[in-house]
Amino acid sequence: TIRKQGAVPATIAIIGGVMKVGLSKEEIELLGREGHNVTKVSRRDLPFVVAAGKNGATTVASTMIIAALAGIKVFATGGIGGVHRGAEHTFDISADLQELANTNVTVVCAGAKSILDLGLTTEYLETFGVPLIGYQTKALPAFFCRTSSFDVSIRLDSASEIARAMAVKWQSGLNGGLVVANPIPEQFAMPEESINAAIDQAVAEAEEQGVIGKESTPFLLARVAELTGGDSLKSNIQL
């Protein structure tokens, strides 16, 4: 378990306008019951959801903000947001990337969500000086898949190596986060061909239906789950 490894599990969310680090079972169940009625909260939305006393599900960006306020230097999530496909026309780029460029928190994940443009996402991270570390891998994990056709910026093979890099970065005044990409366990990974076909279809449907902005990711993930007969959701849960 997480505790046996020396860490403390603490789910981050906004409950009744309070930024919370560590939720009770009842609070987690509340968010589950409320479902899509819970506001998706990124940096832009955070003050308004808190001021209105609402419940909020935090993105990577707002989770980083709350973690930093609480003195937490590392957290885990399924996958970071990034540059959406077609962003050269829409400018649809997740606020997660700017938060990673500015906030001193390390995000451990299974790479960027594979519904995104992984190539442009890696380029964006490079431009803003965000290290993209592959944990025991040189290939960038792609959320549902263990590999992709893109590389991480550096491979590190132990937690101690990563911790030393974090310390040196921040002690040197190099503000901003780090991404640690840890591939999904092999037994839960999906074949690239099948998941990419489902993603391509979901992206096309989103364009046809005019789904844009913060609604894009929930729509695409839900549609990919439908197109894969629930297999992608099973993989997502394992992340």
Q: Where are the regions a protein language model picked out?
A:
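Glycine-rich nucleotide/cofactor/substrate-binding loop typically near the N-terminus or early
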Residues: 1-50, 171-187, 192-195
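General beta-strand structural signal in soluble alpha/beta enzymes
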Residues: 9-14, 50, 56, 74-79, ...
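Glycine-rich beta-alpha junction loops
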Residues: 16-18, 81, 111, 136-141, ...
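Active-site glycine-rich loop that binds ribose-phosphate moieties when present
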Residues: 57-60, 88-101, 105-126, 159-164
